[in-house]
Amino acid sequence: MTDLKASSLRALKLMDLTTLNDDDTDEKVIALCHQAKTPVGNTAAICIYPRFIPIARKTLKEQGTPEIRIATVTNFPHGNDDIEIALAETRAAIAYGADEVDVVFPYRALMAGNEQVGFDLVKACKEACAAANVLLKVIIETGELKDEALIRKASEISIKAGADFIKTSTGKVAVNATPESARIMMEVIRDMGVEKTVGFKPAGGVRTAEDAQKYLAIADELFGADWADARHYRFGASSLLASLLKALGHGDGKSASSY
């Protein structure tokens, strides 16, 4: 197996196959569930808006892949600093049956100098998730933070407040995941000594098998080749799947989605 084939198979099994569009429908989510079951293995999860969780759960069960996890988003995409609303949305997502919640960190508050609200928001959402055995990923929106010190600070605050994963981006801003921001965030995980318990998720802009290979290489360099499993690493993407399947000899590499 070539290096690209090997990394593509790894990446496929680490995907949170995503649709987070204003025009999402039951039909589109059902199609996403079907796509998550591929000839070479299943994606780790799908990521959808909370209202679609019941139809996704039903579809995944009916197609014989109940092990594919369902992730959803809260405080999304703007990362507001109202803790009560973020917590209410997170509790609602859990009630819908989410296995994982990706919550947006109040990054604009951090940019304005307020570190406390981010900590308090993540901590509140973590307590709700932990009580239901739901994984919490925290989106810090690196493309808006821009500054390395702010990316580092948002990562540290999220981890201290209980994040199970730190995630680069919503996919809804001009700049999403980059290898540079990925390295900074994973270095925080390493420097804090939490690589056993905290994972990393690049999202938005990871579109090709070659892109995925680059991101996995950074993880392998920092943590060794065994670290990036589904408990420690995910790709938030949709169009990536077609490219990975093409690299693995399935399909033409074309995708209907741009995430």
Curated annotation (Swiss-Prot):
GO molecular function, one term: deoxyribose-phosphate aldolase activity
Gene label: deoC
Enzyme Commission no: 4.1.2.4
CDD domains (UniProt xref): DeoC
GO cellular component, one term: cytoplasm
Alphabetical keyword list: Cytoplasm, Lyase, Schiff base
Name of this protein: Deoxyribose-phosphate aldolase
Cellular location(s): Cytoplasm
Species of the source: Escherichia coli O139:H28 (strain E24377A / ETEC)
Cytoplasm recorded as keyword: yes
